[in-house]
Amino acid sequence: MFYSIVAIFVGAGLGALLRWFLSLALNEFFPAVPLGTLAANLIGGYVIGIAAVVFTTRVGLPPEWRLFVITGFLGGLTTFSTYSVEVMTHAVQGEFGWAFAVAALHLTGSFALTALGMWTARAWLAAA
């Protein structure tokens, strides 16, 4: 149990720091679509795709790695709540086009990158 807690704790901290750095570096460039939040969710989509394949095909990996990557790192990196408030802020201000655009970018981008991550992992594993 101790190693599971440490894996989640360290992963979440690293994921949250990366999300914060992405926001600092990217959000100022296009305020209508905060690119830091978008980047965090798209990176998370790609990594979860890889992780889903790796952790289902490499069953011998210690469970702490899954907790570190998925529960910890990706839990700290990706953000549904920030995405939600960014979409709703546009909607409340009557900017329905922007609200739809932000929602569509996050959803379609995350699904596409999750699929790409799964494809990437399968290709890597097949080549190994």
From Swiss-Prot:
The keyword Transport applies. Pfam families: CRCB. GO terms for cellular component: plasma membrane. Na(+) is not transported, but it plays an essential structural role and its presence is essential for fluoride channel function. GO terms for biological process: cellular detoxification of fluoride. The keyword Nucleotidyltransferase does not apply. It is a multi-pass membrane protein. One of its GO terms (molecular function) is fluoride channel activity. Keywords: Cell inner membrane, Cell membrane, Ion channel, Ion transport, Membrane, Metal-binding, Sodium, Transmembrane, Transmembrane helix, Transport. The chain crosses the membrane at residues 5-25, 35-55, 67-87, 96-116. Na(+) binds at residues 75, 78. It catalyses: fluoride(in) = fluoride(out). It is found in: Cell inner membrane. Fluoride-specific ion channel. Important for reducing fluoride concentration in the cell, thus reducing its toxicity. Belongs to the fluoride channel Fluc/FEX (TC 1.A.43) family. This is Fluoride-specific ion channel FluC. It comes from Burkholderia lata (strain ATCC 17760 / DSM 23089 / LMG 22485 / NCIMB 9086 / R18194 / 383).
